[in-house]
Amino acid sequence: MVENKKIALVTGASSGIGSATAIELAQKNVHVIITGKTLSGLQVTESKIKLDGGTSTIAQLDMNDFVGIDRLGMEIFKRWGKLDILISNAAVLGILGPLHHQASEDFFDVININLLSNHRLIRSMDALLKKSNFSKALFLSSSMASTPKSFWGAYAISKAALNHMVKIWANENKNNNLSIIIVNPGKTRTKIRAKAMPGENEKVLQTPEEVAKKIVGLIFLNKVSKGEIFDILQI
């Protein structure tokens, strides 16, 4: 029964790492709330979860919809009264190229989804996480957060700012049981990677499933430093 399970929220769960992580969590007897912009992708994820005997709830959501994020938090409270696990995975690559060529609207779209929507998630889920005795939050970042690589513009900037924001939130919660960590998944076979590196040999990349197993392993690890950044390739 769902009442006896931990409750997790996974954003960007319609494909890639988000989908694989949701499936992996469900296999650990966690009820997973899966969000994403594409309903068909969420339905595929849900079908895979059910096939393995797991349970999930679809909450179709565009991360640009900040009011929708708030509404999701309220619905989670009404239905379950708490949130045990938050996996913030949703992100967009945007347009790669020189900064001075990037249109403001394209730049802001990346910042909105990769950074500001995460602030809204923190606002909406903080109290719910603190109602749990388990209380874990994990944010997917990128190696580009620490590497000012040419032409990665808004994406790299958004991930660098995300890391800083999450570390601040972790510091603000150093005296309670809410565990907050950041993960750099490394080179993985995802849509974002394919868009950024067209023609790359996929065989040399990790699969989303391989990354998901390590993410879920970190979630159930008893001792991690708050605000710590984990490089999946080194785990």
What residue spans do the PLM features occupy?
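Substrate-binding pocket helix/loop in short-chain dehydrogenase/reductase
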Residues: 97-99, 103-111
